[in-house]
Amino acid sequence: MLLLTLIFLPFLGSVAAGLFGFYIGRKGSVFITTLTTFLSCIFSLIIIYNSITNEYEYIIYISNWINSGLFNCNWCFLFDSLTMIMLVVVTSISTLVHLYSSQYMAHDPHLSRFMSYLSLFTFFMIILVTGDNFMQMFVGWEGVGFCSYLLINFWFTRLQANKAAIKAMLVNRISDLILLLGVLTIFYNIRTIEYFSTFAAISIVKDFKFIFFNYILSIIDVACILIFIGAMGKSAQIFLHLWLPDAMEGPTPVSALIHAATMVTAGVYLTARCSPMFEYSMFSLKIITIIGASTAFFASTVGLVQNDFKKIVAYSTCSQLGYMFFACGLSNYPLAIFHLSNHAYFKALLFLCSGAVIHAMGDEQDIRKMGGLRRILPFTYIMFLIGSLSLMGFPFLTGFYSKDLILEVAFASFSETGHFAYWLGTIGAFFTAFYSTRLLFFAFLSETNAYKNIIKNAHDVPLEMGIPLGLLAFGSIFIGYISKDMFVGLGSDFWNNSIYINPFNNQMIDAEFLPTFFKLLPVILSFCGLFGAFYLYFFKFKFLYNLKISEYGLYFYNFLNRKWYFDKIYYEFINQYILKIGYNVTYKMIDKGLIEMCGPYGLTTIFSFLSQQIILLQTGYIYHYSLLMLISTIFLINIIFFSIIYYFNIITILLFLFIFLLIK
């Protein structure tokens, strides 16, 4: 009963705030939604404590959902170690975001609707991580996509919010369709979509092949690649990352919830959940490693030149997701989930601090129009500093324990893809430290560039916003140290059967014996980025400006500022051709052509022509009508007295045509 209550409490809170918000008021909506999410958090902590102490796993059968032929799908909830970790992360971050939003959105007239959306978002994420099969997971998958549309477009009178929400929806629909194809591939070959049955049958079908355009492809490779592309869209990996920075158009608590604990982490969760499949597909693991490392490097370079406060933090999310994915590609799924849980706390802290800064600065998000906030917002500055240091991987903070270990495992794999991931991830760590320090400089450490009246009215966060920041700061400092041995400690049996790693792919032991130089290199480069940015922006700012306006510097700056021209390529080369095909083929040839000719216009034209031909038979001569009656009588007699085989016998047809010509 406790497990079902945990799942449906956020849904009840969402319904109460959404349907009865007018009657219970703004405070009532805030209280109910925050309370239900908080209770879910408490219950998830109780459940994971029982799981750790007693090694329990739970499967709750609710009912049969779909039963059609060979397709049988039940509505079940699975509670294993992976699910419980995700539940703790989702519900704890969601509770703090709810509490923060109660004050941050206090002056918004639609607060009840906003709180309802947040709770619904949390509910669908819980459905996603507790699903016992791919179909139930897909319900939660689509639910978080739908809720992200509602939340990004919460201020629906703003054109940019409309465009950002539609963009997020469209990009995710593409990846969701490919994910669905992956699920259908699994069902077609295994005849089930339940996790346990599917994973148990993988060893049987792993050698199945099929021919596609003269290429021999493995069933497992195709299914894994399709599932990974679905995860790429949800977790904003390179090529499908376009929606992530635009999602900053929503309220800041939405950004914190999406980036820290819900939507973008769903792809990493799905990859870890399908680890028994991926372990039999070395090709897909290599692709995941390359895509993850490329994303980590790409996003860290783009973050160097951004000036929007929230977009800098958003690109850091994209970069950190790359680390999680290439950890999965290196078959170290527990390490990826470890980094996911660590990242959730310091990323939520960074976003909520950015919301406090934007709120204090009168909704200004351009960091060039800030400065000097360390004196005006001292508490927010300290919290943001803790989150930034944890993001950089500063020694003994939460981010350090997972981020550096991912890079060590990458080098210890002793493979081309592993070393590719190590070097790109290490360079990405340098850039991460650089743009984090740049953000600190412009927002907090430099002389202020804000208007005088804004500085006068700026104030630090109230208690309702300060409590979540303090708790997240605690997590950003200690969670990594506390949970490291449980997540990735040698000999830890915490994960049981929820994650499978092929013994030949496990590099955790090898990572312990790396040369010291390769272990320390990411930390050294992070410090170089930290002190390098500090030195350049404090003492050599003119040098940076001259470098930027130089011939090659300007080209490089534009390349990064335009996000490697991905938007330009997609809009001008892909979207334009697709739109032209949509107009010239789909609209003009099919919709207004084939369908119209076979449909309304064609039928109207045919019947008009037939009516005109029938009119010609009305000659007004009685002998014409008598002759037609005679022909009709002969025709009917022919039908009655002869077999149906002779229905169209040649004599009758010739006679009918001859008389018809005489009439004309």
UniProtKB/Swiss-Prot annotation:
Membrane topology annotation: Multi-pass membrane protein
Any Gene Ontology biological process: electron transport coupled proton transport
Keyword Aminoacyl-tRNA synthetase: no
Residue ranges the record marks as coiled coil: none
Keyword Ribosomal protein: no
EC number of this enzyme: 7.1.1.2
Catalysed conversion reaction: a ubiquinone + NADH + 5 H(+)(in) = a ubiquinol + NAD(+) + 4 H(+)(out)
A single cellular component GO annotation: mitochondrial inner membrane
The entry's keywords: Electron transport, Membrane, Mitochondrion, Mitochondrion inner membrane, NAD, Respiratory chain, Translocase, Transmembrane, Transmembrane helix, Transport, Ubiquinone
Any one GO MF annotation of this record: NADH dehydrogenase (ubiquinone) activity
TM region positions: 2-22, 28-48, 77-97, 120-140, 168-188, 210-230, 250-270, 285-305, 321-341, 342-362, 376-396, 424-444, 462-482, 521-541, 590-610, 614-634, 639-659
Entry's family note: Belongs to the complex I subunit 5 family.
NCBIfam families noted in UniProt: NDH_I_L (TIGR01974), PRK06590.1 (NF005141)
Described function: Core subunit of the mitochondrial membrane respiratory chain NADH dehydrogenase (Complex I) that is believed to belong to the minimal assembly required for catalysis. Complex I functions in the transfer of electrons from NADH to the respiratory chain. The immediate electron acceptor for the enzyme is believed to be ubiquinone.
UniProt-recorded name of the protein: NADH-ubiquinone oxidoreductase chain 5
